[in-house]
A protein has these predicted regions:
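ABC ATPase nucleotide-binding domain helical subdomain, centered on the C-loop/LSGGQ "ABC signature"
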Residues: 1-39, 83, 92, 152
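ABC-fold ATPase nucleotide-binding domain signature/coupling loops
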Residues: 23-52, 67-70, 74-77, 144-153
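C-terminal portion of ABC ATPase nucleotide-binding domains
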Residues: 28, 32, 84, 88, ...
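ABC ATPase nucleotide-binding domain "signature" region
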Residues: 45-46, 52-57, 81, 97
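A short, proline-enriched helix->beta-strand linker immediately N-terminal to the Walker B motif
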Residues: 59-63, 92
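Conserved D-loop/post-Walker B switch-helix segment of ABC ATPase nucleotide-binding domains
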Residues: 75-85
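Conserved catalytic loops of ABC-family nucleotide-binding domains
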Residues: 85-97
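Conserved H-loop
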Residues: 99-101
Length: 153
């Protein structure tokens, strides 16, 4: 965690772990923050690695936070909790999210939909559902998949 911000306080680290949905699994590790992570994070799951990376970014309190497919290894419920926590941050940063998961973008001020490298649509979630067939197809296919898996889209 100190790779994100040297000299970060325990409170700052705990806040970043809470927001990134990492606190529970970090608290379960022997030694907690002194737990040794192997080269490449081999002793962590993909979702744990992603959440710790997000925590390291959050602990810096950036003005701009870029999340590039940051939830690909997270289940739908954890992804939703992460998005909600980021929206609720004090002095919330400007967040750019690159995602193939439509649910990760639902509350964005502006969504840009790309199809074969070209802009297929721009707008809010509701605007795109009404006016962009590419976005609507992606959203509906992912929403049906989440329902069948018992998750939240």
């Amino acid at each position: 965690m100190w790779m994100g911000k040297k000299g970060a306080t325990d409170e700052q680290i705990d806040e970043a772990l809470e927001i990134s949905q990492s606190k529970e699994f970090v608290d379960s590790k022997q030694g907690r923050l002194d737990y040794v992570i192997e080269q490449g994070g081999k002793n962590l799951s993909g979702g744990q690695r992603q959440r710790l990376t997000i925590a390291r970014a959050i602990v810096r309190k950036p003005d701009v936070l870029i999340l590039d497919d940051s939830a690909s290894a997270l289940d739908f419920a954890t992804d939703a909790a992460l998005r909600k926590a980021i929206r609720g941050m004090n002095n919330s940063p400007t967040v750019f999210i690159v995602s193939q998961r439509a649910a990760s973008l639902m509350y964005a001020d502006l969504i840009i939909v790309l199809d074969d490298g070209k802009v297929a649509g721009m707008g809010t979630h509701d605007e795109l559902l009404a006016n962009c067939e590419v976005y609507k197809e992606i959203y509906e296919s992912q929403f049906k998949k989440a329902d069948s898996e018992g998750g939240v889209a």
